[in-house]
Structure formats: structure tokens, C-alpha cells
From Swiss-Prot:
Residues 889-952 form the SAM domain. Zn(2+) binds at C1091, H1094, C1099, C1102. It comes from Drosophila melanogaster (Fruit fly). It comes from the Eukaryota. This is Poly [ADP-ribose] polymerase tankyrase. GO terms for biological process: positive regulation of canonical Wnt signaling pathway; positive regulation of JNK cascade; positive regulation of proteasomal ubiquitin-dependent protein catabolic process; positive regulation of protein catabolic process; positive regulation of telomere capping; positive regulation of ubiquitin-dependent protein catabolic process; protein localization to chromosome, telomeric region. Interacts (via ANK repeats) with PI31. Stimulates proteasome activity, probably by ADP-ribosylation of PI31. Modulates 26S proteasome assembly.
Length: 1181
């Protein structure tokens, strides 16, 4: 718009040009300059809205706002200044302060009621003004107070079209977007409120997942931020790059309150992302239990499938959560069916498990929702629910029972169903009101409640009785209730203890009144039949006749037993009821309970002397009346044989039901006279045995042959059962009629673990049976014999061992200082680094090899290694005399060393990091990489050079305390031998390469000899101890070991304290004679997660490392199945797990002390793809 068409010179009038005699000039000047004292002095009700007639007809507020005088603006507003006053151009005070960027004044005016969308004569809004003048803060304030950014001025321009470069991002929603997103993520409410507008509330991040502020706030549980965003129009349906809505984020991280806020704001609980994951998938897979419950209560469907055809139930990681989700889903489906009164759907859903499902947030049960349904099928639905066991008196969160709701809504059919089923007629809600209070205005409802003994005298918390709320016609009814005896019978039926108490105490004779219009039942008949326990107890205590029979000859005990009311039955029997009383048809209470399948009642009656053989008029015993489906009742009536059968079959539930103090030690009279514990022990039914022992079973009971339960467990090798029996003080040396102890049984049957257990708990290995045989004479298995031999060691063998030890000590040779160096090393290298002693060791394949003792010796100041020798010792493959070698005589610092290696460009870096020669001597590849030497070639060159320098000068050398790794050349005999052992011990494993990868050969990259004096001396000492304890035989072998903690082992040795008790043979250190088996553990148990770089268990790129170790096995305990141990068995130094059907495929060697093994070689290798193997390579799997 051209300036000629509209003058935008706001406040351009020079007040100095106004006539000197203008009486308002001083006021306008004071407002302009912000002189608050002068303004207060000059302002009056007449001048507060005065006009500048010499200018644009502005008011004092125009001037103060335009010049940003906040105090003056505030005073003028408090003094009655018009906030909507217009000057001659239609400008309001808000236009002025917006145009000049006075953000504080803008907020003050908006707070005082100024319209953010007011327009001037050219249809300019304050936002047009602020946008065109580049006033960012003002634009933010206006948008935050509802400014409409789509309004067009008289030239059809929006604020965005007029926006300055600075304000354009505000109007596009891009202004400081990253800060806004970060504020939402971090929960910075003040910063968020300062930046938030309707235009950026749903902005998406420019990178990453393209999340909105609501995504971030929901994911990081910023409840306050979420509330602010939702209040400002945040879209709960916005999706990020992966199709996730904010509800996905909140549910995934288990943020319950945020989830609730989003759902209340209209979030779709079944929203799908790009992979068809719903919020419930996220919550279930992360075990967010409370969030799952919330989603299900709002209609989430756990049966929806994601792209992997998995439902939310499938995604739950635990069985408990899967069952809970399925249970709650069924419960909410039933609640929905009841809410809609869908009887056919409810029939399909209802079952005893969910009929009393409670809505987690309203407390409503299916019966509550059925009662309030307006549908005509309400009664049919309620009857269905009550038949299935719906609780009649459950209260919801408002403390209302179903009867309160039915009375409130005057649903007579619902009231009748509830009352007939025994709902509490005088239940109180949170206001102390009964159902009678709720329907006091309606005569039919009141009459119905009074027929069930509703109490008209109950006063609510508001001090009102039902009569005070009743209409005139109802009031008469309430003042003349039915007679007291009828009332008593109805109260006993309904379980109204207060009414029963009041009537009986006022008229004690009425306690045995009769229902003359019915079956001549007494109040006790009704109370017993309807399971009114407190009423039964009260009536019995006040003279009710327990023998009173109705006109069919039924006593109250018949009623209680027929309907399965256990507590009532117990009370009646306790008060003298005859358990064998008969009605007119000769039915006893046991007949009634058996015919109705009431197991607990039958058990109670039998306990108190009920006769299971008594016949009714048709000649039927209680057992004859049992239904085919009631197996438990039939078993109970069978007697001890059922308990013995349950113990034998391991049916714990049956055992629990059938056991009584009288039957727990019953006998199998038709068999070996066994007890239930004999059978449970012999058939390895641990849970049954444990239950029997905890409930008083005789642990030392003998059967017909004199066997106790421990004999059975030992004979059949049931280790856990035997341990349980020993825990319960069984006699471990008990004998049967033939003098056999449990140890005889276990030894004869080759039960190694049981023999060990029995011996550990005092079993006597010398006891003889009637034929004079000890357990060892009956033993068939070698390992059992070894175990018993150890336990029966004589004093003679101890003396022989002592003599052998002395002989070994006196005859041990002194180290030969002139022995040959290790094969493959030069004599000068050997003399400088290795002890000259050599030993013969047994390799994994069974071959033997002569090795030098791997102990580094301190270097003398005169010791020197030639460059060629140094290169060889450090594994400088392919080195030559042309390689750069540091001159030890001229190198005194790092700069000189780097110069000798032609690495001048690294001098500044090393000086900045203050790296000395001593420090450099201790550094490795990773350390150099961290300080900035990223090129592998440079690092290799440095490490090679420093190794040579250390060899010739001793710089940084501490071989006595630290581990030294000596590289072996590929043509070295030791290198060749190790490689041959690696390749020759590859085997095919049962997991088909899942743990260690699929391969048929290795690529051996490097073999390093481990030298550590401290570790070697510790190993040598332990090896000597083992030899002395094992007839001078340490049984040393070379075995493989794979572990993700190779470096720690090389530096500090093996440590049994870190062994895992969950291993097959307990908390030991495991070795293998096959390299492929150890390869399975290089990245952890079962291959862990694979190599660090590619997370691939079968990675053919990344180098791996394992150890070839010396292991002093000593005397090994042979084991064929898993057994958890914390140390080697007594008299043994190791455990050897032997292959067996259903057990190990290849042998394992386990020691339980770290000093029993020494890491001899560190092997770096790669597994090779089978396709990459040369055609001539032999398949050694």
C-alpha cells in the first residue's frame, strides 16, 4: 500500500507544535516521557480519556502505550482509561505499543482486556503492525493471547505477507523451534510458555524422528508441559516419522498420568504406527502394567496384530502380564456388554473368573452396569450374572451397591432379583443412606424393600430417615410395617443382623417362629440356607433349635450342606447338630453335600463322624449320588486310597484337598504298606512330598520291608527329594529288614550325587547289610566307587601319601640355569626374557610338547637385544634390516623418539598431552587412538618402535610385576604347534554354529606368549600342592578357555570369585579340549550378543581372542550330568564333565581355584567362512 493512501506515522505529531495555551499539553507530555508523578497529579476523571485535538486525537493511553511507559499505562488503566479508544486512524493503544515493540505494555493491555484482533481504519490488526516492524516478542505475545494470523488488511494482506525477516519465522512456526522442542523435552515450563504459540504448538523436529513438542513431553513424562500443550491446542493425533502418536511414547515409557491426560484429550487408544504397533503393544512389551490397565479400561484392543502378526498379549514378556491383559480385556468386554445390556454377548463372555471383575477407576462390577441399563433385557442379564456367582453387595467408588442404584432408578425387576438373591437391604452408601432412602418417594419400591425387612429407622449422615423423605402415601406404609415374626423371617433370609437382633431381643420366643405359609421353616433354616453367617451365630447363641425340622424333615444342617455354606455348617456342627440326621426320605446332610458336589462340606462332615455308608430310602449311599464330574468328592468318599493315588501321581491339588491329620500317614494296605510320603519320594513328586512333610507326615515311617522314604528316594536317584527328607531330620543310616541303608541303595544303583549327599550328611560308608556287604561292595559305577573310596580312606594310605610327599620334596630337581631356551626363540632373546627351565606339557589333542617356563626375568643395565632380535620378540612380521630402528644412545625424550620414526607431525600432539617415554611405554592401540593418533599405521609404528626401545634400554620395563606379551613368529615352533592345535580341535556342535559361528577353519593372526612372574609363581605353587596331594601327579594339561574378559585374565589371572553358580557344574572356571567349544564363549555365554562392532556371533571380520592355558587338574571327579557346586568334591581337585546321551556332547574341565590355571598363550584369530576355505583344506569338524 502506498504511503499516500494511508498515513502510518503513528505518534508523529510534534506536541511542541501544539498551541502553547493547550491545557492538556502537559499531561500528554508527561505520558510521553513517563513522568508518573506528574501524570498522577494531572489526571482526573475528565482528562483520563482526553483527546489530543491538535494531533491524531490520541488519548493519554495512546501516548503512554506508544512510548512504552508501563507504569503510566498501568496507572491510567486503574484510573479508568478506555482500552478501546481509537484515534482518528482507528488505532487503539494496543496498535501503538505493538508497532513500537513494547512487549511488556502489550501483555499488560492484553491482560486488561484489549482485543488482540482489533483493527484500524485500514483493517490492520496489532499483529500486522508487529509483524511488519519486526517485533518478535510482540508477535509472540499476541499469538499467545489469541491473535488471528489469517486476518487480511484492506489490501488483502495477512501479517505473514507483511512480515519482516525477523518475524517471519514466528508466523510460520519455525521461530526458535529447536529451543521449543528442547523445552518440551526437558520440562522447562517457563521457557516453553515464552515461545509457545498456536502456530508452533504442533511443529515437527527437523531431524531425528520429526517429533512434535507433545511427543517429547509425553515420552519424557513432563506432565505440566503436556497440560500446557493440550490447553494450547496440541494435536494428540500428530504422528512422527515412524507413525507414532504421543500416546505411543507415553505408553512405551510407562507414564501413567501423561497417558491419562492424552486419552482425556481424545487420543485414539488403538492408533497404529507404520509397523501396526498400538500403544498397548508398546506398554505390554515394556511391562507397563498400570498403563496397560488404563488403556484396556478405555477400550484398547489387545487382539490387534502388528506387522509381525503379534498381538499385545503376545508382546508381553511374562506369563503373568499376558494373563493379566487377557483377564482385564475379558473383564472390560463383559462390562461393555452389561452396559449395553447385550445378553447374548454377555453369555459368551461371562465365567466365574470375570463375573466379579471390577472397573479399576469407577469400581463398577458387571452387576452395577446391568442394574442401571434401561434395556428391557436387564432382568435376564442380572439373572445370568447372579447364576455365575456375581457378588450382590459390592460397592463402587461412590459406595453404591447394585441395590442402591436399582432403588434410585426405580428398576423394580432389578430390585426383586437382587433381594431374592440375598442382597443386603440395609446397606449404607457414602451418605449413610439405605436403598429405602433412595426410593422413599415410590410406594411400590418401598413395599418391596419392607418385605425384605428394610429398616425404616436408619438415619442418614444428613440426619434424615426414609420417612422424612417419603411422600404422604409412602409415609403411611412406613408407619405400619408387617408383623414382627414375618419381619424376623425375612430379616433372617436377607441377613439383616440388626433387625434380627432387635426383634429377638424384644421378643425372645420368636427366635424359633415358623413360616406357616411355607415349609414351616424357622429363622435358622432361612439363615442357614442363605449363608447368613452372623445371623446364624446370633440365633444359635440366643436359643435357636439346631434340631428343628421343617415339614419335609429337613433340619438347618441339611440346608447349609445342600448349598455348600461351609462356615454355617461348621457353626451348626459346633453347636451340636447331628451330622447323621435324616429327613423324611432318609437323606443325611452328607447325602445332600455329596449330591451337590460340595467337597469342603463333605470333608467337614466326615471329619465330624458322618457315616459315608449310610443309605437313603432308595438304598443309595452318599457315594452313589456323586455326579460323574465331581471326581474330588468321589475320591474323598473313597478314603485313604485316593490320597495314596494322588501322592503317587504327584497331583498336589488333590493331595492338598485330601490330606487331613488323620489320613496324612495312612497306609497302602493292599501293597507294601507305604505311606503317601513313601510314594511321593519314590515317584519324585517333590511338591507333594514337601506339602506332606510340612503338614506332619512321618519322615521315618517304615513300610512292610522296613524301608523309609529316604530309601525310596536314594534307590531311584531323586536328589531333591533326598535333600528335602534330610532337611526334615530323616535318619540317613536307617536300615530296612535286610540291613540296607539308603547309601547301600544309592551305591548299588550308581547314584553318584545321592551318595555324595548322603556322605555329606553323615552316612556311614562302613555299615554292612545282613550279607556283610558295605556300600562300596555293591557299587557298580566307577565314580561311585571313587567317592566311597575317598570316604573310606585308611590311615595306611594317609601314611603312604605323607611318605610320597616327603620323597617328592627331597627329590625335586633344582632349576637348570643352563637349560635350553624355548623353541623358536634365539638364545640371546631367551636369556634376556625367559627363565631357562623347560617342561613337557600335554596339548589338547593328546600330543606332548616341551615348553620353557614363561617367567620374565629383570633386565640388567648391560642387557641389550639386537634390532633383529627385538623385532622377532615383538612379532614384527615381515621386518627387515631396512626398518627404522630407534637409537637408544641418542633418544632421551618423546620428541627424539618420534623423530627417529619419521613421525614429526605428532610431536606437538604428544607434548600437548604431556606424554613421556615412560607413559608411552605403557600405552596400547586404544590409548593412542584416544589421544588422537587415529591412523592404524602410525600407531603400529609407534608401538613397534617403543617395544624395541624398551627391549634395548629397559624403559618402562616392569616385567616382575606386570604381564609381558611376547609375539611368536609364524615360523616359530610354538606358533606352529598352537595353530595346529587350534585347527585340529574344531568340531561341529549341536547348536549348528548359533553361539560361535559356522566355520571349518581359523585364520590365526597372532600368537603371544604370556609372561607374568606373579601369576606363574602362584600357579607353580598350587601345582606342587596338587602333586603332593595326588601321589606326585599334578595331571597338568593344556586346555582352551574362551571369555569376554580375556584381558583381565591375562593381566590378573583367573579369579574363582567371579565364577557363575549357574554353570552346569556350579561356580567353577571352565576349560575345553576343543577350540571350537571355547570359541562359543569368546563373546559371552551362548555367544553373548556377538562382536562389539557388528553384533554378529558369526562375524568373519572382527578378530577374536582365546587362551591356551596350563591347567593342573589333579584328581578329577567324573560327572555325567549337571550338578551345582561351589568347590571340587572332597578329595578331588577338579571336575571333568564327560559326554553322555542327553548331556554334554564334548568334555568340559572345571577347576574351582583360579591359581590352578595359567594363561600360556593369547591367540588372536578370525573364523573363516566355509566358502573361503581352500579346496584342499580338510574338513575337521
Amino acid at each position: 500500500m502506498a504511503n499516500s493512501s494511508r498515513s502510518r506515522a503513528i505518534l508523529s505529531v510534534n506536541l511542541d507544535a501544539v498551541m502553547a495555551n493547550d491545557p492538556l499539553r502537559e499531561l500528554f507530555e508527561a505520558c510521553k516521557t513517563g513522568e508518573i508523578a506528574k501524570v498522577k497529579k494531572l489526571i482526573t476523571p475528565q482528562t483520563v480519556n482526553a483527546r489530543d485535538t491538535a494531533g491524531r486525537k490520541s488519548t493519554p493511553l495512546h501516548f503512554a502505550a506508544g512510548y512504552g511507559r508501563r507504569e503510566v499505562v498501568e496507572f491510567l488503566l486503574n484510573s479508568g482509561a478506555s482500552i478501546q479508544a481509537c484515534d482518528e486512524g482507528g488505532l487503539h493503544p494496543l496498535h501503538n505499543c505493538c508497532s513500537f515493540g513494547h512487549a511488556e505494555v502489550v501483555r499488560l493491555l492484553l491482560k486488561a482486556g484489549a482485543s488482540p484482533n482489533t483493527t484500524d481504519n485500514w483493517n490492520y490488526t496489532p499483529l500486522h503492525e508487529a509483524a511488519s516492524k519486526g517485533k518478535v516478542d510482540v508477535c509472540l505475545a499476541l499469538l499467545q493471547h489469541g491473535a488471528n494470523h489469517t486476518i487480511r488488511n484492506s489490501e488483502q494482506k495477512t501479517p505473514l505477507e507483511l512480515a519482516d525477516e525477523a518475524t517471519r519465522p514466528v508466523l510460520t512456526g519455525e521461530y526458535r523451534k529447536d529451543e521449543l522442542l528442547e523445552a518440551a523435552r526437558s520440562g522447562a515450563e517457563d521457557r516453553l510458555l515464552a515461545l509457545l504459540t498456536p502456530l508452533n504448538v504442533n511443529c515437527h523436529a527437523s531431524d531425528g524422528r520429526r517429533s512434535t513438542p507433545l511427543h517429547l513431553a509425553a515420552g519424557y513424562n513432563r506432565i505440566g508441559i503436556v497440560e500446557i500443550l493440550l490447553a494450547n491446542g496440541a494435536d494428540v493425533h500428530a504422528k512422527d516419522k515412524g507413525g507414532l502418536v504421543p500416546l505411543h511414547n507415553a505408553c512405551s515409557y510407562g507414564h501413567f498420568d501423561v497417558t491419562k491426560l492424552l486419552i482425556q484429550a481424545g487420543a485414539n487408544v488403538n492408533a497404529n504406527d507404520l509397523w501396526a504397533f498400538t500403544p498397548l503393544h508398546e506398554a505390554a512389551s515394556k511391562s507397563r502394567v498400570e498403563v496397560c490397565s488404563l488403556l484396556l479400561s478405555r477400550g484398547a484392543d489387545p487382539t490387534l496384530l502388528n506387522c509381525h502378526s503379534k498381538s499385545a498379549i503376545d508382546a508381553a514378556p511374562t506369563r503373568e502380564l499376558r494373563e493379566r491383559i487377557a483377564f482385564e480385556y475379558k473383564g472390560h468386554c463383559l462390562l461393555d456388554a452389561c452396559r449395553k445390556c447385550d445378553v447374548s454377548r454377555a453369555k459368551k463372555l461371562v465365567c466365574a473368573e470375570i463375573v466379579n471383575f471390577v472397573h479399576p477407576y469407577t469400581g463398577d462390577t458387571p452387576l452395577h452396569l446391568a442394574v442401571v441399563s434401561p434395556d428391557g433385557k436387564r432382568k435376564q442379564l442380572m439373572e445370568l450374572l447372579t447364576r455365575k456367582g456375581s457378588l450382590l453387595n459390592e460397592k463402587n467408588k461412590a459406595f453404591l451397591t447394585p441395590l442402591h442404584l436399582a432403588a434410585e432408578l426405580l428398576h423394580y425387576d432389578a430390585m426383586e432379583v437382587l433381594l431374592k438373591q440375598g442382597a443386603k437391604v440395609n446397606a449404607l452408601d457414602s451418605l449413610g443412606q439405605t436403598p429405602l432412602h433412595r426410593c422413599a418417594r415410590d410406594e411400590q419400591a418401598v413395599r418391596l424393600l419392607l418385605s425384605y425387612a428394610a429398616d425404616t429407622n436408619i438415619v442418614s449422615l444428613e440426619g434424615l430417615t426414609a420417612a422424612q423423605l417419603a411422600s404422604d402415601s409412602v409415609l403411611k406404609l412406613l408407619k405400619n410395617p408387617p408383623d414382627s415374626e414375618t419381619h424376623l423371617l425375612e430379616a433372617a433370609k436377607a441377613g439383616d443382623l440388626d433387625t434380627v437382633r432387635r426383634i429377638v431381643l424384644n421378643n425372645p420366643i420368636s427366635v424359633n417362629c415358623r413360616d406357616l405359609d411355607g415349609r414351616h421353616s424357622t429363622p435358622l433354616h432361612f439363615a442357614a440356607g442363605f449363608n447368613r453367617v452372623p445371623v446364624v451365630q446370633f440365633l444359635l447363641e440366643h436359643g435357636a433349635e439346631v434340631y428343628a425340622a421343617d415339614k419335609g424333615g429337613l433340619v438347618p444342617l441339611h440346608n447349609a450342606c445342600s448349598y455348600g455354606h461351609y462356615e454355617v455348617t461348621e457353626l451348626l456342627v459346633k453347636h451340636g447338630a447331628n451330622v447323621n440326621v435324616s429327613d423324611l426320605w432318609k437323606f443325611t446332610p452328607l447325602h445332600e453335600a455329596a449330591a451337590k458336589g460340595k467337597y469342603d462340606i463333605c470333608k467337614l462332615l466326615l471329619k465330624h463322624g458322618a457315616d459315608p455308608m449310610k443309605k437313603n430310602r432308595d438304598g443309595a449311599t452318599p457315594a452313589d449320588l456323586v455326579k460323574e464330574s465331581d471326581h474330588d468328592v468321589a475320591e474323598l468318599l473313597r478314603g485313604p486310597s485316593a490320597l495314596l493315588d494322588a501322592a503317587k501321581k504327584g497331583n498336589l491339588a488333590r493331595v492338598q484337598r485330601l490330606v487331613t491329620p488323620e489320613s496324612i500317614n495312612c497306609r497302602d494296605a493292599q501293597g507294601r504298606n507305604s505311606t503317601p510320603l513313601h510314594l511321593a519320594a519314590g515317584y519324585n513328586n517333590f511338591e507333594c512330598a514337601e506339602y506332606l512333610l510340612e503338614n506332619g507326615a512321618d519322615v521315618n515311617a517304615q513300610d512292610k520291608g522296613g524301608l523309609i522314604p529316604l530309601h525310596n528316594a536314594s534307590s531311584y536317584g531323586h536328589l531333591d527329594i533326598a535333600a528335602l527328607l534330610i532337611k526334615h531330620k530323616t535318619v540317613v543310616n536307617a536300615t530296612d529288614k535286610w540291613g540296607f541303608t539308603p547309601l547301600h541303595e544309592a551305591a548299588q544303583k550308581g547314584r553318584t550325587q545321592l551318595c555324595s549327599l548322603l556322605l555329606a550328611h553323615g552316612a556311614d560308608a562302613y555299615m554292612k547289610n545282613q550279607e556283610g556287604q558295605t556300600p562300596i561292595e555293591l557299587a557298580t559305577a566307577d565314580d561311585v566307587k571313587c567317592l566311597l573310596q575317598d570316604a573310606m580312606a585308611t590311615s595306611l594310605s594317609q601314611q603312604a601319601l605323607s611318605a610320597s610327599t616327603q620323597s617328592l620334596t627331597s627329590s625335586s630337581p633344582a632349576p637348570d640355569a643352563t637349560a635350553a631356551a624355548a623353541p623358536g626363540t634365539s638364545s640371546s632373546s631367551s636369556s634376556a626374557i625367559l627363565s631357562p627351565t623347560t617342561e613337557t606339557v600335554l596339548l589338547p589333542t593328546g600330543a606332548s610338547m616341551i615348553l620353557s617356563v614363561p617367567v620374565p626375568l629383570p633386565l640388567s643395565s648391560s642387557t641389550r637385544i639386537s634390532p633383529a632380535q627385538g623385532a622377532e620378540a615383538n612379532g614384527a612380521e615381515g621386518s627387515s634390516s631396512d626398518d627404522l630402528l630407534p637409537d637408544a644412545d641418542t633418544i632421551t625424550n618423546v620428541s627424539g623418539f618420534l623423530s627417529s620414526q619419521q613421525l614429526h607431525h605428532l610431536i606437538e600432539l604428544f607434548e600437548r598431552e604431556q606424554i613421556t617415554l615412560d607413559i608411552l611405554a605403557e600405552m596400547g592401540h586404544d590409548d593412542l587412538k584416544q589421544v588422537g593418533v587415529s591412523a592404524y599405521g602410525f600407531r603400529h609404528k609407534i608401538l613397534k618402535g617403543i617395544a624395541q626401545l624398551r627391549s634395548t634400554t629397559g624403559i618402562g620395563n616392569n616385567v616382575n610385576l606386570c604381564t609381558l606379551l611376547v609375539d611368536l613368529l609364524p615360523d616359530d615352533k610354538e606358533f606352529v604347534a598352537v595353530e595346529e592345535e587350534m585347527q585340529a580341535t574344531i568340531r561341529e556342535h549341536r547348536d549348528n554354529g548359533q553361539a560361535g559361528g559356522y566355520f571349518t577353519r581359523y585364520n590365526i593372526i597372532r600368537v603371544q606368549k604370556v609372561q607374568n612372574r606373579k601369576l606363574w609363581e602362584r600357579y607353580a605353587h598350587r601345582r606342587q600342592e596338587i602333586a603332593e596331594e595326588n601321589f606326585l601327579q599334578s595331571n597338568e594339561r593344556m586346555l582352551f578357555h574362551g571369555s569376554p574378559f580375556i584381558n583381565a585374565i591375562v593381566q590378573r589371572g583367573f579369579d574363582e570369585r567371579h565364577a557363575y553358580i549357574g554353570g552346569m557344574f556350579g561356580a567353577g572356571i571352565y576349560f575345553a579340549e576343543h577350540s571350537s567349544k571355547s570359541n562359543q564363549y569368546v563373546y559371552g555365554i551362548g555367544g553373548g550378543i556377538g562382536c562389539p562392532s557388528h553384533k554378529d556371533k558369526s562375524c568373519y571380520v572382527c578378530p577374536r581372542q582365546l587362551l591356551l592355558c596350563r591347567v593342573a587338574l589333579g584328581k578329577s571327579f567324573l560327572q555325567y550330568s549337571a550338578m551345582k557346586m561351589a568347590h571340587a568334591p572332597p578329595g578331588h581337585h577338579s571336575v571333568v564333565g564327560r559326554p553322555s546321551a542327553g548331556g554334554l556332547h564334548f568334555a568340559e574341565y572345571v577347576v574351582y581355584r583360579g591359581e590352578q590355571s595359567y594363561p600360556e598363550y593369547l591367540i588372536t584369530y578370525q573364523i573363516v567362512k566355509p566358502d573361503d576355505s581352500s579346496s584342499g583344506t580338510e574338513d575337521t569338524r
